[in-house]
From Swiss-Prot:
It comes from the Bacteria. The gene is rpmJ. GO terms for biological process: translation. One of its GO terms (cellular component) is cytoplasm. GO terms for molecular function: structural constituent of ribosome. Belongs to the bacterial ribosomal protein bL36 family. It comes from Trichlorobacter lovleyi (strain ATCC BAA-1151 / DSM 17278 / SZ). PANTHER family: 50S RIBOSOMAL PROTEIN L36, CHLOROPLASTIC (PTHR42888), LARGE RIBOSOMAL SUBUNIT PROTEIN BL36C (PTHR42888:SF1). This is Large ribosomal subunit protein bL36. Pfam families: Ribosomal_L36. Keywords: Ribonucleoprotein, Ribosomal protein. InterPro entries: Ribosomal_bL36, Ribosomal_bL36_sp.
Length: 37
């Protein structure tokens, strides 16, 4: 999980979702998981 100011899709499997007002990227590759903060 990376915490970044701007979250972007890295690969085709990445999905951008909003959970409790927090923008997240979830992916099969753990390295690609991101959270905005």
């Amino acid at each position: 999980m990376k915490v970044r100011a701007s979250v972007k899709k890295i690969c085709d499997k990445c999905k951008i979702i909003k959970r409790k007002g927090v923008v997240r990227v979830i992916c099969d590759t753990p390295k690609h998981s991101q959270r905005q903060g």
